[in-house]
Amino acid sequence: MNKPVDKTPVVSVTQTGTLELMNAANAYWPAAHRDAKLMADLALAAHTIAGLEAVRLPFGLTGEAASMGCRVNYHEDKNDFTPTVECGFPSYDNLPVPSPNEGLMGTIMDAVGLCRERVGCDVPIIVGVTGPFTLAGHIRGVNDILTDVILDPDLVNKILETTWRISANFAGALVKKGVDVIAFIEPTASIIGPDFFKAYALPYLKKAAASIRAPTVLHICGDSLPIMEMMVETGVSGISIDQKVSAIAAKSAIRGRCSLVGNIDPVAVLQMKGDQGVEEECIRLLSEGVSVLAPGCGISPYTRTSQIAAMVKARDKYFEHRI
């Protein structure tokens, strides 16, 4: 990553499932969250039908927690909800470290294999891996972990010593399975502030990223500018920014040390605006120097396929005019 290219790639490092693509692939949530074939079919649709230049899976952040034994709510009566973790553990002394081939992580691994069979070696596969601090929040509960960083730092570090290994083990196994890019997704780390990020998120993200023999991306929701320097310090190959972040400011903060991924607003622009609005936003971001054109967060299930395809068309138009 961060090397000269003929055209800026158009991908998503966050979730890509939409209702239109579910219909087209005959692969619907919630089944596609936990069935390898349906997961692969839906993930592939964002590439083969919508035109994104990579295949990205899964569609939620529950693979690691579910494989550890946490209860997951799949919202069985809804096909527009991503799953949520609803319970953790009564004790944190001997947390399980599941094999990447077990449980929902194993399902994701199987889906990766199916995707690779379908696209060959020419199309990148991106897999989202839950970041260590976010996984700690799944295990402990988000409200509790936010209190613990103040009142019980030893407990937080004890949990993180397990979660970073789970994230890293899973990511490493995915790379061996044929995944090209690992996207560490750390939404919970966005709400702890720079000081706590430095103490609790940064050290474990660094260890996880250093263990991966493939390009890595770190996505953190919200205004990540106050922690941008530390995001670079994690050692990832690319930083994915939320739509709330100025691409110009982020590029200035990164100073060429890694790639900048982003950051089309997935709702206000990608879902709600027409082709012209999407085109204008994409061209603005390309002119501001993003390395990879992508949504600033997970694609809304209500996004039309034509709007996703408009990202690629806008990129092509931008580079045609530069020749």
Region roles according to the model:
Residues 1-20, 53, 99-323:
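Active-site loop segments of alpha/beta catalytic cores
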Residues 22-26, 64-76:
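Glycine-rich loop at the start of a catalytic domain that most often binds anionic cofactors/ligands
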Residues 23-51:
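Active-site-flanking structural segment that lines cofactor/substrate pockets
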Residues 33-34, 59, 221:
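Active-site nucleophile and cofactor-binding loops and adjacent substrate-binding regions
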Residues 43-71:
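Glycine-rich, N-terminal phosphate-binding loop and its surrounding beta-alpha-beta segment
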Residues 61-64, 79, 132-134:
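A short acidic, glycine/proline-enriched capping/turn motif at secondary-structure boundaries
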Residues 71-85, 137-146:
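Short, flexible, mixed-charge acidic loops at enzyme active sites
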Residues 77-114:
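A gly/proline- and charged-residue-enriched helix-loop-helix capping module
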